[in-house]
């Protein structure tokens, strides 16, 4: 049996769905699953300190290979002792491969078998990223969980294009495995692609499972498709992945999508959504989204969320938060970001309890009704 640096332990399956309760053991600690991972693109979760993230209960955070490669540079971070030491974070870190950022640069990139040529968004210089380079950068960063370099095709691209793309991504995954110099302390995940095509998802998963990665990511979702389309892809993709390894749905952070992903057997999620919307004054609460900058909250001296026990809700009012954000004060962004991250990490805690109690579907229904989703449009 292969000795992986990342291992998944299944604790319990929910009786009525594909949801599973477990934990993932990494070189920098163990965290429970299902789990939402805050995103620290530039080696920091925007406005939050490592101590605050630990208070929130984030046992793992995500950082971005592409951005750290460009600035300050992966070799500098290696000289600093690795990403954990550089950013003073002693728990687990996951790094993406840079593939999604390159996907986002559609107008300035060129994809070949060797890799991707694109323009540096900081200074316009020409850059080249290959599977080997993506692995080398992540080896220098020293993250606990790494991602294979992949192409993320658009969800509605033609079948023939997506087929060629997933076949190239499989070849890139094999090249990345061979280039990986730290398999003893960094777990490399394969990324299943295939847009909305079931047979291509099946082909991609079969290729990658055959390479025996310690975990698997589901990519190419949350890129413009509908909620129903995402659920349909998860319905036929997640069962293709090994039960004894972690499953990670990339780029998903809307509460309903988190719950529906868990129902389909996903263990890990990440998204910039909670911090991005928080900085603009949009807060997630147990009764739906609340835009605290709105004028009606100017004299509202109640907490953001009466059902939340986070630091922000225990100490500050909607009126004060509105004042800070209207005045462009960083402290306001810190407080709303803290709350939104706490909300999603705590939502996953509630989901784990619902799995333990075998009542996840009832929890989902109750949550959707309170949050304000039209549950009839969120069928699964």
Swiss-Prot record:
It holds the Pfam family TGT. Substrate binds at residues 96-100, 150, 193, 220. Pathway: tRNA modification; tRNA-queuosine biosynthesis. One of its GO terms (cellular component) is cytosol. Gene3D superfamilies: Queuine tRNA-ribosyltransferase-like (3.20.20.105). It comes from the Bacteria. The keyword Phosphoprotein does not apply. GO terms for molecular function: metal ion binding; tRNA-guanosine(34) queuine transglycosylase activity. Keywords: Glycosyltransferase, Metal-binding, Queuosine biosynthesis, Transferase, tRNA processing, Zinc. The active site is at 96 (proton acceptor), 270 (nucleophile). PANTHER family: QUEUINE TRNA-RIBOSYLTRANSFERASE. Homodimer. Within each dimer, one monomer is responsible for RNA recognition and catalysis, while the other monomer binds to the replacement base PreQ1. Belongs to the queuine tRNA-ribosyltransferase family. This is Queuine tRNA-ribosyltransferase.
